[in-house]
Amino acid sequence: MAISKERKDQIIKEFATHEGDTGSTQVQVAVLTADINELNDHLRTHKHDYHSQRGLMKKIGHRRNLLAYLRRTDLPAYRELIQKLGLRR
């Protein structure tokens, strides 16, 4: 269910704002989005896994808060990130 270390490193490299960046808001949102997508796939096959469903809801809430923060502080970066991740239509 969790994303692999290789996939996580790939996401970090893609969304990092500078060398060694692992904690910027953009990186955190991208990693959470990958986790959320993995959990969604898991829950499609295991519909009654309520423990994982709760974890999914917590991750979605965390991502929502990070996106709200990014929108408040850096609107162009927010727009670029949601376009890159395909979160809004």
Swiss-Prot record:
GO biological process: translation
UniProt xrefs under InterPro entries: Ribosomal_uS15, Ribosomal_uS15_bac-type, uS15_NS1_RNA-bd_sf
Protein name per UniProt: Small ribosomal subunit protein uS15
Molecular function, one GO term: structural constituent of ribosome
Gene designation per UniProt: rpsO
Alphabetized Gene3D superfamilies for the sequence: 6.10.250.3130, S15/NS1, RNA-binding (1.10.287.10)
PANTHER family in the record: RIBOSOMAL PROTEIN S15, BACTERIAL AND ORGANELLAR (PTHR23321), SMALL RIBOSOMAL SUBUNIT PROTEIN US15M (PTHR23321:SF26)
Free-text function comment from the UniProt entry: One of the primary rRNA binding proteins, it binds directly to 16S rRNA where it helps nucleate assembly of the platform of the 30S subunit by binding and bridging several RNA helices of the 16S rRNA.
Signal peptide residues on this chain, from the entry's feature table: none
Similarity comment text for this entry: Belongs to the universal ribosomal protein uS15 family.
One Pfam family in the UniProt entry: Ribosomal_S15
GO cellular component, one term: cytosolic small ribosomal subunit
PROSITE patterns with a match to the protein in the record: RIBOSOMAL_S15 (PS00362)
Keyword line: Ribonucleoprotein, Ribosomal protein, RNA-binding, rRNA-binding
Assembly and oligomerization: Part of the 30S ribosomal subunit. Forms a bridge to the 50S subunit in the 70S ribosome, contacting the 23S rRNA.
Lineage, broadest ranks: Bacteria, Bacillati, Bacillota, Bacilli, Lactobacillales
HAMAP family per record: Ribosomal_uS15_B (MF_01343_B)
Keyword Cell wall biogenesis/degradation in record: no
